[in-house]
Each structure stands twice: as structure tokens, then as C-alpha cells.
């Protein structure tokens, strides 16, 4: 079993795990899970990718998933925007992650695209698997 940590974002806990890697000019990876998933469902895929590329990575569970805090209210049609524009930037700031390569599946891919399209902070790139477009 892979040990997860928790970090406070806006007064609520988010489950996460940092996969260590060498200091590199290459961007760190951030894995964004699908709509019915959580960090644990990525299994060892992030570890293998980070190791093969030689970079650190972040895997986390959004609010309401895995061992992160539950939702405070029912989701609205803008929940992907809230994750992309509020929660993800706060998490990246707290963990000191700048200009990541975002890797998202389904909801996670949509969050990555919305986050990057906002232009609020630079990303190194996006791998978007089955986004809602």
C-alpha cells in the first residue's frame, strides 16, 4: 500500500502523494483522476511514468473522493471550473509546484484544460485523456 499524506486547502483536507524525482529542468507531473476515481486508482502508473521520465510527480484526490474531505455542498454544473480555477491552484501553491505538466483522465482532463485555458498560471503542457469537450 502506498502511503498518502493530507494537506489543508481552504480549511479542508486533501489526500495527496508526492513521488520524488531528481531536480530537473523538466516539469513535474500532476495526475488528475477521473470522475469516479481517486488517487489510489492510478495505482503505480504515476510512479512508473515519473521514474521513466526522471521527474517528480503529484497524485491527489479531489474533495469528495478517496480520503479527501467530503463535499460541502452539492456539485453545480461549474464544479470542474471550481476545481480548475480554485482548488488546483491552491494545492499547487501550497506544495510549491510551478509550471507542471498536467495529466488528466475524463473529469481530470477537463480540469487540466480549464486550468490551462484560464491563463492564470503557466503550465508546461497537458495530456488530456477523454476530456468533456
Listing of model-derived features with the role each one plays in the protein:
Residues 1-13:
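N-terminal cap/lid segment of alpha/beta-hydrolase-fold proteins
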Residues 10, 36, 78-82:
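Conserved phosphate-coordination/catalytic loops
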Residues 11, 25, 55, 93-99, ...:
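Active-site acidic short loop of glycosyltransferases
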Residues 12-70:
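Conserved HGGG/HGGXW glycine-rich cap/lid loop of the alpha/beta-hydrolase fold
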Residues 43, 89, 113-117:
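Short, hydrophobic alpha-helix immediately C-terminal to the catalytic nucleophile
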Residues 45-50, 74-77, 119-120:
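Glycine-rich, phosphate-binding/catalytic loops in enzymes
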Residues 53, 59-101:
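Active-site loop/oxyanion-hole signature of alpha/beta-hydrolase fold enzymes
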Residues 98-133:
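Conserved hydrolase catalytic core segment
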Amino acid at each position: 500500500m502506498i502511503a498518502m499524506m493530507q494537506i489543508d486547502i481552504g480549511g479542508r483536507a486533501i489526500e495527496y502523494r508526492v513521488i520524488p524525482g531528481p531536480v530537473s529542468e523538466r516539469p513535474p507531473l500532476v495526475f488528475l483522476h477521473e470522475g469516479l476515481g481517486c488517487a489510489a486508482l492510478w495505482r503505480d502508473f504515476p510512479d512508473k511514468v515519473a521514474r521513466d521520465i526522471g521527474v517528480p510527480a503529484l497524485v491527489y484526490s479531489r474533495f469528495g473522493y478517496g480520503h479527501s474531505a467530503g463535499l460541502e455542498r452539492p456539485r453545480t454544473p461549474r464544479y470542474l471550473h471550481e476545481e480548475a480555477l480554485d482548488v488546483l491552484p491552491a494545492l499547487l501553491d501550497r506544495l510549491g509546484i510551478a509550471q507542471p505538466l498536467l495529466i488528466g483522465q475524463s473529469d481530470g482532463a477537463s480540469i487540466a484544460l480549464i486550468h490551462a485555458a484560464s491563463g492564470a498560471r503557466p503550465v508546461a503542457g497537458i495530456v488530456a485523456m477523454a476530456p468533456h469537450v
